[in-house]
Amino acid sequence: MRKLLVLFLSFVTAIAVAQGIDANTAAKAITAAGLKEHLSIIASAEMQGRETGTEGERKAAAYLTSQYKKFKLKPGNNGSYSLPFTLYQDKVVSSTLKVNGEPYALDKDYWVNASSAPQKSLKTNAIIFVGNDFNDKSTVDVKGKLLVATESKERSIYKIMAAQKLGALGMIIIANNNPSYPSNLTGRLSLKPSAASNFVSMTVSKSLGSRLLGGSKDFSDQELADVPKAVYTTTIDWTAERSNGEVLSADVMAVLPSKEKTDEYMFVTSHYDHEGIKNGVIYYGADDDGSGTASVVAIAQAFAEASKKGFSPKRNIVFMNVSGEEKGLLGSQYYSEHPVYPLEKTSVDLNIDMVGRIDPTYKGDSMNYVYVIGEDKLSSDLQPITDKVNKNYNMELDRRFNDPKDPNRFYYRSDHYNFAAKGVPVIFYFNGTHADYHKPTDTVEKINFDLMEKRVRIIFETAWEMAMKEEMLKRDLPLNMPGR
């Protein structure tokens, strides 16, 4: 009788504890101090900027794994917290470039994606300047010609793709002096060895661009905009030598298992890689995307603590920090092509990429905001849930970047996209860009942790709603993925 009484009281206590857990209470485990503790490690000098495939990134992965083990979350990949993959790197070992007989230096005056370098050499005596609005509707005869274009808000890859489609020999992009070009363009990584291409392309400095277009001095932005679209007599002599290599990287995965819908999943994601070290300077990546990575860890911790008090999700919650985002969303692409869990049984991906800062649009009293991107694309269930959760926080949920005509195309620029491309509903949480974006000055000291706490609590409560929903999210909106 005594044993039955003890069992009965234990059962009643368990029910009472479970009933006492709600999302808003559980979210209070996420604090500004806790976020700062995690981010101060993730974006520390010890992590060396966390470039994909480097020792610094491996240290960051080890830290993430240690936290998930500490929270007693299960390994996310068949008994392992690591989902390893191989990336292929084609490098330009050496290159020479002469324009009208004058030599120019690789990684100073021009930058080359190895797969777009000439097989051996390229010589031409004429170029066609097509400005900043070139597209595949152009009526200019570009077949077999080398084109020169200027950057615009639209990504340059679309101009390059248009040039290839119209049969051009290649395209030169005149840069807006973006300091991230060297690492982004030389030695680019990919999930497959790149095939040799007959189409060539390179990015050049504004100074070299001015010489290509006949300028004896560097053009100002306005002077460059006023250059006529025409054929220019310019002699180009370009050679290149390439090499191939492999880089090993890994996504980090942990899971809070469900006891109910054991074959259904939802994801909370971030990317933990950044830009590494350039010219001896560490690019810390505190906001991009140390903030998202610290957020995923804090959300995982809050769910783990709630589970100790009786919370049990209706479907499995997967916490994943991916690598290779800065190299082209490669870690999430690898997962989408080699999923550990069926994508058709994955209800949603909540992706967190840059949530610790304030962009120039918001300042002062108006900084109580977060950009919410992608919730209108695949499921009509998403926005009502987001709005319901926000009633506890009264934050400005800014949806301006959902506009398909927005030139920034942020929807295509973070890891949720690879889930969406497979039909999985997504929400991307984002604070917008700022002056320290992709610069070594993106440091922990500039993070607004009080605002970050509020943003992350909203994401946590949204994840809670997704985890406890009786049915998976409807996929009732058309899958329209024009490509990045």
State the predicted function of each range.
Residues 301, 434-484:
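His/Asp/Glu-rich mid-to-C-terminal helical/loop segments that flank catalytic regions of hydrolases
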Residues 20-23, 109-137, 194-285, 301, ...:
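Soluble metallo-hydrolase cores and metallopeptidase-like ectodomains found primarily
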Residues 105-106, 199-204, 209-217, 322-428:
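Metal-dependent peptidase/peptidase-like ectodomains
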Residues 105-200, 283, 301:
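Extracellular/luminal Protease-associated
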Residues 48-143:
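Noncatalytic luminal/extracellular "stalk/propeptide" segments of secretory-pathway proteins
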Residues 18-76, 97, 257, 476:
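N-terminal hydrophobic or amphipathic helices/low-complexity stretches enriched
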Residues 1-23:
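Bacterial Sec-dependent N-terminal signal peptides
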